[in-house]
Amino acid sequence: MSVLPSHLKYADSHEWVYLDEEGHAVVGITDFAQESLGDLMDVHLPEVGADIDQGEEIMSLESVKAASDIFSPLSGEVVAVNTELEDEPERVNDEPYDGGWLFKLAPHDLSEMDDLLSDVDYQGLIDQS
């Protein structure tokens, strides 16, 4: 297990998020989540322009072990997706906090960031798993 990046906020459903320089919320899954899933075979990305609520299912990942729904840590409009994952889903396994990002949102309510976990709190959650 890698050290959790401290600049990210975490959902208890194992997604991470941070705000980029344009104010968009960049979303991915944690190293814990990708390890639990195993080798990814397919990524079903959301549609750009989709409007999503915090905690709502937005996409899915298929691995050699199972299919898993991904939930949005914030409400907002999808403004970008990582299309490189369509040909290289293994990037989520290899670079969960970097090149394996999933999608970007234009967030509707930044106060929702307060609902998310710090790296320390998320580590406590996964230590109980």
From Swiss-Prot:
Its cofactor is (R)-lipoate. One of its GO terms (cellular component) is glycine cleavage complex. Gene3D superfamilies: 2.40.50.100. The keyword Acetylation does not apply. The keyword Endoplasmic reticulum does not apply. GO terms for biological process: glycine decarboxylation via glycine cleavage system. The modification N6-lipoyllysine is found at K65. CDD domains: GCS_H. Pfam families: GCV_H (PF01597). It comes from the Bacteria. Binds 1 lipoyl cofactor covalently. Keywords: Lipoyl. HAMAP family: GcvH. PANTHER family: GLYCINE CLEAVAGE SYSTEM H PROTEIN, GLYCINE CLEAVAGE SYSTEM H PROTEIN-RELATED. The glycine cleavage system is composed of four proteins: P, T, L and H. Belongs to the GcvH family. This is Glycine cleavage system H protein. It comes from Hydrogenovibrio crunogenus (strain DSM 25203 / XCL-2) (Thiomicrospira crunogena).
